[in-house]
Amino acid sequence: MIRFSSRYMIAALLLCGSVHFAQAQKVMEEYEVFPTRLETDIPYRIPAIATASNGDLIAVADYRYCRMDIGFAGTGDGRIDLRASISKDNGQTWEAPFTIVKGKGRGFDVFHTGFGDPCVVADRNSSRVFLLSCAGNVSFPGGTREKHQGIAIMHSEDNGKTWSEPKDIAEDVYAMFDKCSRGPVRAMFIGSGKIHQSRYTKTGKYYRLYCSNLVTDVNGARLNYVLYSDDFGDTWKVLGDKEDVPIINGDEPKVEELPDGRIIISSRCGGGRLFNIFDFENKEQATGKWGKQAFSG
């Protein structure tokens, strides 16, 4: 069962820099945003959260008809929907969950089988919200360059109330790694629940977005890169030199912007976490280099 308790909700919002401590103190009671009360209920999994420019909180989660991760349903249907709930009072109460996109299950085109593991970010200066998720019916471990998970993107123009149809950008992202020494990559898991909007860098209409990915290279090694977008998620580029891998042997990475504008990536590993920091030579052109990978233990 997934519960958003007051302390977890507060922690998530403070990490987003969206709620002052005095406001957070007012959230005293636990509220079950995505209820899964019985074993027979369709389970919710993998929640993500963002704060819209109007102050609304937008929570998104998998609604797993197949009860499994993407690609692990075996001979089952494989259907996973994405659902959202909105709070207009800083998390004290939430609207009933509604469907952003329905998975169609096995038997349709592979991309629309299911959508899961979302990450979401809201533009600070407009009513636009961007969502990215895995898609399809191929597991991450089972991915190949020719047959892999999709990467679905969706936009909302009204602070998360309604959403565009999903678009698959997987080929554009995979192709960026085809000609590097570790490519072509065999599989990719993008976002890991976190997209960050820069507080400082704006080269066009929007402040820059950053997210991280987990890939298996041509030899099966697990690598983490950071991607960035200057058009609010429509297109993405690799931060830094693709030959200069920021994290090796990490899993489920997250990316954040330091107070001085540098970019830090943090990735889970056995016994702790791996870290690296990107120093910019030119922030607008996104040029610079990664430091040396460090272990928290």
Which stretches of residues belong to each language-model region?
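Bacterial Sec-dependent N-terminal signal peptides
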Residues: M1-K26
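Asp-box/BNR beta-propeller blade signature and adjacent active/binding-site loops
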Residues: Q25-G297
